[in-house]
Amino acid sequence: MDFDQALIQLKQISFAWPGLKEPVLALDQLEVMPGERLFIYGPSGCGKSSLLSLLAGVVKPDQGQVRVLGQALTNLSSAARDRFRADHVGFVFQQFNLLPYLSVLENVTLACDFSPARRNYLKRNKLAAFDEAKRLLTRLNLPESLWQASVTQLSIGQQQRVAVARALIGSPPIIIADEPTSALDRNSRDQFLDLLTTEAEASGASLIFVSHDEQLQSHFSRIIYLPEINQVTSSYIDNSSTTAR
């Protein structure tokens, strides 16, 4: 893999949460390429949440380099990283983080309110934010009868679709999903993953999906078992686990 062409680049990373003496994550190198569908899995405590926080610029490493779209996130202030993330990363959270006092459409277009880059994308393509939100919700099979409703009136599966539409609007180049299928049964989970991967591919985004459930890996083009590359947890690898690739 050509490190210079990677969309996301991590080198010689060490990270510990404040108040902890020992790192929870130590990586030699990790790259994510443009358009890649990457599945990262592992048990609780192996560093998945820490890795996502680094990839999205929520936190900075204690040592090493994180580059996203050629930008060294380690050189940015917290506020600058927040702005960068709003412009370039669509995040699907485990709990969705939808605002209960906004309608479905307003929750989706909220991502554009915080992102000049997403607004500029829509402007260049002569798209209105609400029209693009409606297109995405239609693609994600959310009935039009729900678009003006509060998200509190939606089922878990419907809320997921709203969260995905919010992540995708304005075509950010990176989509990160943090265990968004944990509350779903198997059939609903597979349908959701098919929708997510299809929409990410249609928009040309790289998709990074994190889970503890290795059964989901068939939906992705590249698989990483995090304890195999995290030097902090590598000594606890179950030899029967799928080899990272």
Give the predicted meaning of each segment:
Residues 150-154, 158:
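Conserved ABC ATPase signature
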Residues 64-72:
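Conserved ABC transporter NBD signature motif
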Residues 171:
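Conserved catalytic motifs of ABC-family nucleotide-binding domains
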Residues 56:
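Helix-to-loop junction immediately C-terminal to a conserved catalytic motif
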Residues 72, 116, 124-145:
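Conserved ABC ATPase "signature" region
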Residues 164:
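Hydrophobic anchor residue at the start of the ABC signature
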